[in-house]
Swiss-Prot record:
GO terms for biological process: transcription preinitiation complex assembly. It holds the Pfam family TFIIB. The gene is tfb. One of its GO terms (molecular function) is DNA-binding transcription factor activity. This is Transcription initiation factor IIB. GO terms for cellular component: transcription preinitiation complex. The lineage of its organism: Archaea, Thermoproteota, Thermoprotei, Sulfolobales, Sulfolobaceae. InterPro entries: Cyclin-like_dom (IPR013763), Cyclin-like_sf (IPR036915), TFIIB (IPR000812), TFIIB_arc (IPR023484), TFIIB_CS (IPR023486), TFIIB_cyclin (IPR013150), Znf_TFIIB (IPR013137). Transmembrane segments: none annotated. SMART domains: CYCLIN (SM00385).
Length: 307
């Protein structure tokens, strides 16, 4: 059935009996078979969407919103190529004029204190995200968390760097991206203690729920960076699963447990890596790897072949 407003007024067929044939571009009466109107141009999209999110994603009207840009990418930008619409280079006088326009355009984009804060924060977030090789989805989540923190006034009296780092860590935890607080803190001016304090504040004030970190989430990343085989990584995951069942993981740093499991699995599969190598990649200390190694081998009765 088609909408009443779309039915030709000259038709005697009841509106609920009229259908639209998309392939032929015709309005047809289902009772009589009469072609009421033909050669209709369908002005709707050729794609289908079943949810508002899908509709927004597939729509080609305007650019997509980008959480990692302070104004979400909805403002215009004057190109730096200094060329006209025909692709010809501008003369020096015109180039200076465009330069002045560009400066004023940038100033109008960042007017309020919140705009300046977001502009600085999004640049910092993009920088840290690139250094950590985070996917766009995680960076978008971190940007959304930071924006909520700004709306709540949580940034006031705190450094932008520490709140950005805390937002990134919260996003990583929410999306099960294996990154430790130490890894993130090393790429920012803020110290680890300050980032941890901001992280706890964000969780409490924004009522954000994060899943408990699973040591197995760290195994693939650590193993890949150490160029270990899939068999060794699978063995490490099995060791962690046994440790969970034995209650050895409660209250322990997941990165440290994953590092120790990787160390044990590498020894058992003759892909030896030093504790120092593994500790550096996992972002933990050698002492942590050594202590977790002793606990796992003793409690799980794992026999390590003599070196």
């Amino acid at each position: 059935m088609v909408e009443q407003s779309k039915v030709p007024s000259s038709s005697l067929c009841p509106p609920d009996k009229i259908i639209f044939d998309e392939e032929r571009g015709e309005y047809i009466c289902t009772e009589t078979g009469e072609v009421i109107e033909e050669r209709i141009i369908d002005q709707g999209p050729e794609w289908r969407a079943f949810t508002p999110e899908e509709k927004e994603k597939r729509s080609r009207v305007g650019g997509p919103l980008n959480q990692t840009i302070h104004d979400m990418g909805i403002s215009t930008v004057i190109d730096w190529k200094d060329k006209d619409a025909m692709g010809r280079s501008l003369d020096p006088k015109r180039r200076l004029e465009v330069l002045r326009w560009r400066k004023w355009q940038i100033r109008t984009r960042i007017q309020s204190s919140i705009d300046r804060n977001l502009a600085q924060a999004m640049n910092e977030l993009e920088r840290i995200g690139n250094l950590l090789n985070l996917p766009k989805a995680v960076k978008d989540e971190a940007a959304l968390i930071y924006r909520k923190a700004v709306e709540k006034g949580l940034v006031r009296g705190r450094s932008i760097e520490s709140v950005v780092a805390a937002s990134i860590y919260a996003a990583c935890r929410r999306m099960k991206m294996a990154r430790t607080l130490d890894e993130i803190a090393q790429f920012t001016k803020a110290n680890r203690k300050e980032v941890a304090r901001c992280y706890r504040l964000i969780l409490r004030e924004l009522d954000i729920e994060v899943p408990v970190s699973d040591p197995k989430d760290y195994v693939t990343r650590i193993g890949t960076l150490l160029s270990l085989s899939g068999i060794t990584m699978k063995h490490a995951a099995e060791i962690i699963e046994k440790a969970k069942n034995s209650g050895l993981t409660a209250g322990k740093d997941p990165a440290g447990l994953a590092a120790a499991a990787i160390y044990i699995a590498a020894l058992l599969n003759d892909e030896r890596r030093t504790q120092k190598e593994i500790a550096q990649v996992a972002g933990v200390t050698e002492v942590t790897v050594r202590n977790r190694y002793k606990e796992l081998t003793q409690e799980l009765k794992i026999q390590i072949p003599s070196q």
